[in-house]
Amino acid sequence: MKLSAIDIRDLNLLKYYRLIRKWACKTYSLNDADLELLIYLDCKKRFTRNDFIDGTYTYSWDKNRWERLRKQGWIDVWRHRNRTTIKYSIYKTSFKCSQLISRIYRIMLAEEDLPTSERSKFYKNKSYTDKVYNKAIDDMIKDKDR
């Protein structure tokens, strides 16, 4: 069964996307471009370094993005190259990354709420922006149509 634009609109899938994206970026110390690139790569399942480079064309230039995402554990090697028969390594998003993306989808589908505990990095009332986001989270949780 193929989804249409009306089906997705009826789900209200993108209604709180910005808030959820900001939560994920702040909680997991990512920037917006990194998160969206990881979502793109997760959809590809397995990818090469060239696929990664192709995916970065629409994002801000960040020379260190590849190494940073690998060192932080967002990208894992699926198959190493062996210099004879396998000319390049193949990568996949890590378990940590796929869990984050699954959690984002669950929150977007209202199967799960954003955390509102005091331990949450995102829910601390330190700045004006934090208070605005906290109000938005409270409104999102109360929204019956999401």
Language-model segments: residues:
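Short amphipathic alpha-helical elements of helix-turn-helix/winged-helix folds
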Residues: L37-K44, L100
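Short amphipathic alpha-helical interaction segments
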Residues: T56-Q72
